[in-house]
């Protein structure tokens, strides 16, 4: 189930709004605003400052106090499309898991800006894929504002009369993924544990942590806000779980048969999951699974992984032109 393809700031429960971009592909992430009794919490910021500024303007229109003060900013994980806008949020309290805080330093915004510049005139499959994935964002002049407070496993915070549960389920997508659950409103923000109508990608793993997180989300039967894509419910979590169960099983069969990552990727039939956006992420995912299985021949270089995904993407979009 997904709740339409709305965009902008959407109210999903009393005092809870979700920021939804036009689509949930590379870098186009969701965020949230939780408000009660003049207190506010923002869940994640966006990939660049202009986008975050627009989002905060809309949030301030609905909850005017956001313009001057936000009680808590929570980053669900360390990917830049969920934290690059932190500096624009008027708050002194930024919370994440310990692992997320540590991971934020691994790919600074300046490195992304340099990567985009490097491939501006590159007409190779890798260059075209980098422009497709990241060319629509402005990574200049971002100063990373990192967490002031960290936790492991679980933490509870209060916004007004709302008790909010912060639940660490990583490592999975990244090293420190966190869910944000508001029991009294029946709403959960999943970060990138859920991609809806798009293919998830596993930077960290293990996959069993991700599967367990999906089971946990589904069991809550809450209004479910994914990191990317439309708002969903338990069925969305089950679909992502089923993707990982399928891919783990199919990859293990081919690993046991001695196939390389590249050959396994081209041999696996995604079935219904082939219709999900960014299906080329199968390469990164199988590579991560092979690492779990103990392969010594996995790709560790991120640019090489993007080159492999770009080659698959080119084959699927050979008649399209980007940027």
PLM segments and residue spans:
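Divalent-metal (often Zn2+) His-rich catalytic cores of metallo-beta-lactamase-fold enzymes
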Residues: 181, 187, 209-271
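Active-site neighborhood of phospho(di)ester-bond hydrolases with catalytic His/Asp-centered motifs
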Residues: 43-45, 69-77, 95-97, 169, ...
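Active-site metal-binding motif and surrounding structural segment of the metallo-beta-lactamase
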Residues: 38-40, 50-96, 220
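Ligand/cofactor pocket segment of small-molecule handling proteins
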Residues: 153-217
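C-terminal regulatory/interaction regions
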Residues: 257-323
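Metallo-beta-lactamase
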Residues: 11, 109-168, 184, 214
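Conserved beta-strand hairpin/beta-sheet module of binuclear metal-dependent hydrolase folds
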Residues: 10-61, 178-191
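Divalent metal-coordination and catalytic microenvironments
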Residues: 15, 34, 44, 59, ...
